[in-house]
Amino acid sequence: AFQKWCKKRYKTIDAVNEAWGTAFWAQHMNDFSEIIPPRYIGDGNFMNPGKLLDYKRFSSDALKELYIAERDVLESITPGLPLTTNFMVSAGGSMLDYDDWGAEVDFVSNDHYFTPGEAHFDEVAYAASLMDGISRKEPWFQMEHSTSAVNWRPINYRAEPGSVV
């Protein structure tokens, strides 16, 4: 699927080589069939940044297509009901281009989890600002939020009194 996405985006393998700077990275390709998803190298070397960026774009596009397909089925059997999916917008970034997704949902929503440390309030404000942009200043919803322990963090910190609204 990544090969097809690259072919649609770049049209020629030479355009891929140019965009990814494969001459510098000694990764020149002669055919779209030579394109593979990025792999962990494990020796401390960096992976090709152009390829990584395009793989993130591909991943976002593929997941958005799946969301649209599911949304369209739901719209056909539940007309008039608003549909959305949870975004995970944070300062940590994401593989998904949520700004591109914003127009596909009936309302924008976010999941946000308590981040231990001094930057917690800054991170919450940053994520909220991003959500304002994605929603084009329309109201947006907070779908999930942790007020205490989660099962996926090795150490959980309690929220300071008054910090959870």
Regions found by a protein language model. Give the residues of each.
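Active-site clefts of carbohydrate-active enzymes
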Residues: I36-K56, H112, A127-G162
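Active-site phosphate/pyrophosphate- and oxyanion-stabilizing loops and adjacent acidic/basic residues
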Residues: R71-D72, A128-S129, V165
